[in-house]
Amino acid sequence: MLFRSLLSTAVLAVSLCTDNASAAKHGRFGQKARDAMNIAKRSANAVKHSLKIPVEDYQFLNNKTKPYRVESLPDVHFDLGEMYSGLVPIEKGNVSRSLFFVFQPTIGEPVDEITIWLNGGPGCSSLEAFLQENGRFVWQPGTYQPVENPYSWVNLTNVLWVDQPVGTGFSLGVPTATSEEEIAEDFVKFFKNWQQIFGIKNFKIYVTGESYAGRYVPYISAAFLDQNDTEHFNLKGALAYDPCIGQFDYVQEEAPVVPFVQKNNALFNFNASFLAELESIHEQCGYKDFIDQYLVFPASGVQPPKAMNWSDPTCDVYDIVNNAVLDPNPCFNPYEINEMCPILWDVLGFPTEVDYLPAGASIYFDRADVKRAMHAPNITWSECSVESVFVGGDGGPEQEGDYSANPIEHVLPQVIEGTNRVLIGNGDYDMVILTNGTLLSIQNMTWNGKLGFDTAPSTPINIDIPDLMYNEVFIENGYDPQGGQGVMGIQHYERGLMWAETFQSGHMQPQFQPRVSYRHLEWLLGRRDTL
């Protein structure tokens, strides 16, 4: 999950009561949450219900892993299967700096591979994805209780969710990082220690994530390649959804937002005069010329460095849009623009871009019984950290105190060239990282000897996976069984990089379009040649 301030300073001060000291802790990229929170070896189909696996058949249960085993979870009224969670130190013997993990081995035929998932933020817990995106069960906002996830990534592979960097979720330690290189160095140490506990060697490794993890994933993947150690770091591919890979505020948000509104105005409901005002800003601030020149195939050339002038709000068309849309739709969610009122109860306390918990409700992972069951430390858990996980002030390309270069400049090309199996995807209903902004970033990246894609993406993604989540309900109500979704996106592959545009999906693609995300993972793992 990726966060930034979407409201003007005046509106924040009045309606969210955010003081300057709090706002100064985070850059534009990460402030949003804090304002409110103060060809396959095997094939595997999506499944509705899994068979219970006897404990004696658990693949990774041994004397070292036994203390991490999770036997049950509160409010989960079905068998968890093989599951582990807890803390593993970054440096052996120093438990004061430890990362928290959840590990769910595949429920199918055993595979010698690990798929790592990282949420973004920066500072947002990967337990969000575990519980609401791609874990073995999901508890979505507005739903009564957890249910089995027929499109869980655990159907296909062994999945490891990690709260990182230090200061995120249940992880322990005082943040010290000012760069992605430091975070990747910590993760390399943690991951090797984790593998030694679980007796893992010579596994294929895939690194995945979303949002600000568009920075984590390439840097950690590149660090794995740099280890030159296939026993522990045999990187075979990477995936990043709605990722911060290029210049975030100008290229991935501000420049493409007006065309985005024009395309989706049935959801924004802006009148003709306001649309004309937006179009005028789009042209006068140079965004139209920038898109016309650089969002072309093949790439027209290296894009000039761009940065927003935050002292002059005239060209901050993104915030103008986000403020205005709250009038026709007070429950507008930039993570998924088709959401309308009411704001749904969310067991993680973050249903849209605002912190919301009804009276009498509790945050699931902050419950004492849940912490005990998951071997978690007795600290306050929040979906995103209140304090910054970087200590570089408001510097760096995203004003988060993270001074590393944007991934398109070096590490992402390195990972593509080192694996020839990288997927970058964007959801068309995401207004936090916009689809055309991500494409603009790709068109400014040189990999395997060429700049950008030569050809505009156009090949459809046809999803023939049936509806396994809700089919029983529809059948009970007299409807015919629901089949595949049909065309749900656009794919394009060149020189080791797969582009995937997902229709009707917001920022968290495994949550909003789980069948499409399942197909993406099949490709990443080498189970398919195309999407």
UniProtKB/Swiss-Prot annotation:
Active site (UniProt): S211, D430, H507
GO terms, molecular function: serine-type carboxypeptidase activity
GO biological process, one term: proteolysis
Activity modulation: Inhibited by DFP, and Hg(Cl)2.
EC number: 3.4.16.-
Glycan-linked positions: N20, N63, N94, N155, N228, N271, N309, N378, N436, N444
Enzyme class label: hydrolase
Domain of life where this protein originates: Eukaryota
Family note: Belongs to the peptidase S10 family.
Function: Removes any amino acid from the C-terminus of a long peptide. Digests preferentially peptides containing a positively charged residue in P1' position, as well as arginine, lysine or phenylalanine in P1 position of ester substrate. Also catalyzes peptide synthesis.
Protein name per Swiss-Prot or TrEMBL: Serine-type carboxypeptidase F
Gene that encodes the chain: pepF
